């Protein structure tokens, strides 16, 4: 890729050069050269020495100019697909909940299920169901899960505003079986899971190439840090799906009597 001559400022050409350089060693090039960061360390290896710039007044570059400067073949769309195998370890330290565990701890949300969404009938659980906005969309789900989602979305807004603005919900509370099953109850039935879409596009569940949307892979670590398990790790990959992990649910159980 032809970057062009240096323009003497951290403008579009410089940012394009940085992201092109980063593409050789970073999974997600960001155009940043931070003190002690990996990019500066790599530059040092090739003999780069920072210039003295204390007499230079920095020029402010607009977010739009930065976006246009980053090569499309490096960043691409947030809905572009990346191999699950390229993402490393998923859900470190977290464990998904089973039907047996959920029924033991919270009881059945209702007595009968089908492949279609049906209302929750459990008197115990109904009092903990909440409908509210979590930022980019409104959800209905288990109250502590909804509260947790609000915190997650607030963090995504700060760290990845472009992804935040593209996020939509494909449903949270939905009493039904897992897709393709007539025995396994979906964790959506307890209001403790959510399916996400980006720019209105759903990640295809169990696609032959076992790929996931890039944007979902970026925000998955934030969900993990808040105790949510990413469905991309399921035997049948389900990257649109995020659910409350066992350890997080255990923290809530005393308040869900």
Model features per residue range: what roles?
Residues 3-6, 29-32, 160-172, 230-235:
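Surface-exposed patches in mature extracellular/periplasmic domains of secreted proteins
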Residues 15, 40-43, 146-153, 216, ...:
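Extracytoplasmic/secreted envelope proteins and their assembly/folding machinery
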């Amino acid at each position: 890729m032809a970057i062009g001559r240096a323009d003497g400022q951290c403008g579009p050409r410089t940012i394009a050069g940085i992201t092109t350089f980063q593409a050789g060693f970073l999974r997600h090039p960001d155009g940043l050269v931070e003190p002690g960061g990996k990019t500066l360390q790599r530059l040092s290896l090739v003999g780069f020495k920072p210039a003295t710039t204390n007499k230079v007044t920095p020029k402010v570059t607009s977010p739009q100019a930065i976006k246009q400067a980053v090569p499309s073949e490096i960043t691409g769309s947030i809905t572009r697909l990346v191999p699950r195998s390229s993402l490393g370890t998923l859900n470190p330290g977290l464990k998904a909940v089973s039907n047996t565990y959920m029924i033991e701890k919270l009881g059945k949300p209702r007595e009968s299920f089908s492949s279609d969404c049906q209302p929750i009938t459990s008197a115990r659980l109904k009092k903990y169901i909440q409908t509210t906005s979590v930022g980019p969309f409104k959800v209905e789900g288990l109250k502590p899960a909804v509260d947790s989602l609000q915190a997650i979305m607030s963090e995504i807004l700060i760290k990845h505003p472009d992804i935040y603005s593209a996020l939509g919900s494909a449903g949270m509370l939905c009493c039904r079986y897992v897709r393709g099953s007539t025995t396994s109850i979906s964790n959506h039935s307890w209001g403790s899971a959510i399916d996400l879409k980006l720019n209105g596009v759903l990640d295809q569940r169990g696609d032959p190439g076992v790929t996931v949307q890039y944007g979902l892979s970026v925000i998955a670590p934030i969900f993990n840090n808040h105790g949510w398990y990413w469905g991309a790790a399921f035997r049948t990959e389900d990257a649109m799906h995020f659910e409350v992990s066992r350890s997080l649910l255990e923290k809530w159980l005393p308040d869900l009597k």
